[in-house]
Amino acid sequence: MSEFLFLFRGGDGHALQQSPEKWQAHMQKWVQWMGGLKEKGKLLGAQPLNPSGKTVTGSKKVIADGPFMEGKEMVGGYLMCIADNFDEAVEISKDCPILEFADGVVEVREIQQLPSM
């Protein structure tokens, strides 16, 4: 088994465009999807991220506001899971509710295991 990180992008603007009832129904799909992963022993953790933040860049440690909501590459949340292999992790990601939106993206990354220190 390996650990994987899913990074969620896009879909943020849809909250403003939908009725509260439709948005609640969409959020319930997240609860069901993650609940199913938990029942199967696949879910390690997941959280949404606040839209505001700071970036620290380079050896001079330049601090800037960001990322910004209007950026297409903004990470809105993450999920960590376990899977037998990369292909299984990708299959798991295909059921993510963010993919209901045309701009929804799930980036799947395998977490490297470092040797014990």
Model-derived segments and spans:
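Conserved, structured core segments of small domains
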Residues: 1-117
